[in-house]
Amino acid sequence: LNLDKIPMIKLLKNETESELLIKRQKTKNNCLSKLHEISKVEIPLIAEIGINHNGDINLAKKMMIASKNSGCNFAKFQYYQKDVRIQKNNETEFLHETADGTELSLNDVLERSRLKKEDCLELIKYGESINLPVFFTVFDVESALIIRNMGQKIVKVASMDCNNYDLHSNLNSIGFETIIISTGMSDIREVSKAISIYDQNLEILIMSCRSSYPTSLEDVDLGEISYL
């Protein structure tokens, strides 16, 4: 699918959404994003630490230092409530094999890697001490409220939640200034609908993503970046 040849306006059925997207595009041209403003670099780099710390805060800090030394401008983690993120009937399914061959359920992985509120506060403070701002991907409203109350103004929505319109609606009203949305597995209609939910005063950053690891070269489609 060559997105460069498909006018966004024709893909949207809702005229209000179309008008909103056009207006948002006009207002954002030639403006630096919050990430540019904070990092003061032309291309901000975000270290996707996610849950790779395995719940070990000391390891998370070491990964932050490595990210800083590698030239990254931000570090991003995941913050979630496990009972909300995974359904009860899936807790023992989706086995994950660790490096030593041990099999863990998705429930085990999420529980082991889950950050507590005090962990998030510690990582934010540590990021300030090494000049590496921290922000989080959230998967539920409770987590979003918690990190907003920590003073966080930037939040990220994962690809799996791009079409979670209830989450977008709640993020719109919580008080964040910048919403970053990943778009892996979503089509342009879903992306457009997500954007249309947000008020004009919010900064929305759309990320071109591929939810396959590693991504084959024929699926990369870097031309999508300028389209989005």
Spell out what each predicted region is:
Residues 2-228:
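Catalytic cores and adjacent flexible loops of soluble metabolic enzymes
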